[in-house]
């Protein structure tokens, strides 16, 4: 009896090979079809060819432009038609950033009230007076406005006052800059506080005392003999010799003070004689006690 051999296993199948899709086929698959934009009323008609679809999309766009220029909507034409990629002269969509910029630029600021205009005039008037009477520049005025009173800081710290909506010194400085640039500040509360503070500027109308422009001696030259000839100094400084020679006389006249004749050198002699008088008195008292 012959032994039966087991059946041999089937030969292994070769692995499947996947061919990548052609770029042309992918482009065709992803390209939107113009037939999707046809209205529902044309669904029963036979599908047109590619050339007819392109011609139909172009005519649809032309009809939409004519209807838009006349302010009418043409019935039966869909507004969501997708034109084939790379064809037609369709206009690019408007950018959202550009539209937002146009809206922001067209937004008008609230009109200024008469009180705001009066506050602006007050601030400009104070700036002119400070520049004329105090010789202060705009930067110096701005720095002065930004300085906060330390007493207010300590009071707020002790009372625990923390208001995030409170007008700060930086807000006042920003309002001052906008007024100086000829613009109306957006923060009207800061404008009112700025006008109130600047109108209360101390001694605003008073002019600053003008210093003498005539040159004088330094403190060291007054206390020490520098050995500088006034005539030589006058030639080097390009000033008149007479005015240079009169410097010492004028300064001496300013330093001298009028003293009454009764309080002259006699007071000095009297103070010096006090110890002598006391010594003589002590000697006389001791001598008188020794005689007893």
UniProtKB/Swiss-Prot annotation:
Keywords assigned by UniProt, alphabetized: Chloroplast, Membrane, Plastid, Thylakoid, Transit peptide, Transmembrane, Transmembrane helix
Protein's name according to its UniProt entry: Protein CHLOROPLAST ENHANCING STRESS TOLERANCE, chloroplastic
Name of the gene this protein is made from: CEST
Origin: domain of life: Eukaryota
UniProt function note: Involved in light-induced chloroplast development and growth. Involved in the plant response to abiotic and photooxidative stresses. May be involved in the suppression of photooxidative damage.
GO terms of biological process kind: photosystem I assembly; response to photooxidative stress
Transmembrane portions of the chain: 267-287
Annotated segments matching region Disordered: 1-119, 206-225
Organism of this sequence: Oryza sativa subsp. indica
Biased composition (Pro residues): 1-15
InterPro entries the record matches: CEST/Y3IP1
Compartment list: Plastid, Chloroplast thylakoid membrane
One Gene Ontology cellular component annotation held by this UniProt entry: chloroplast thylakoid membrane
Family to which this protein belongs: Belongs to the Y3IP1/CEST family.
Keyword Lipoprotein: no
């Amino acid at each position: 009896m012959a032994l039966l051999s087991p059946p041999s296993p089937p030969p292994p199948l070769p692995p499947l090979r996947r061919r990548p899709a052609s770029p042309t086929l992918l482009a065709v698959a992803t390209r939107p079809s113009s037939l999707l934009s046809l209205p529902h009323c044309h669904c029963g008609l036979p599908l047109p060819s590619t050339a007819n679809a392109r011609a139909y999309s172009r005519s649809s766009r032309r009809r939409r432009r004519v209807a838009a220029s006349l302010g009418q909507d043409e019935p039966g034409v869909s507004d969501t038609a997708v034109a084939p990629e790379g064809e037609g002269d369709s206009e690019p969509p408007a950018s959202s950033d550009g539209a937002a910029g146009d809206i922001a630029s067209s937004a008008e600021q609230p009109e200024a009230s008469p009180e705001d205009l009066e506050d602006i005039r007050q601030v400009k008037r104070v700036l002119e007076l400070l520049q004329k009477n105090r010789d202060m520049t705009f930067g110096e005025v701005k720095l002065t406005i930004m300085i906060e009173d330390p007493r207010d800081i300590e009071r707020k710290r002790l009372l625990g006052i923390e208001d995030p909506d409170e007008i700060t010194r930086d807000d006042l400085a920003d309002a001052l800059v906008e007024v100086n640039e000829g613009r109306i500040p957006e923060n009207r509360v800061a404008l009112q506080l700025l006008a109130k503070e600047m109108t209360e500027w101390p001694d605003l109308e008073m002019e600053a005392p003008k210093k003498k422009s005539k040159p004088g001696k330094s403190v060291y030259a007054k206390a020490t003999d520098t050995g500088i000839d006034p005539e030589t100094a006058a030639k080097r400084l390009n000033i008149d010799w007479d005015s240079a020679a009169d410097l010492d006389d004028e300064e001496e006249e300013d330093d001298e003070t009028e003293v009454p004749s009764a309080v002259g050198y006699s007071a000095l002699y009297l103070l010096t004689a006090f110890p002598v008088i006391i010594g003589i008195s002590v000697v006389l008292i001791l001598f008188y006690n020794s005689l007893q």
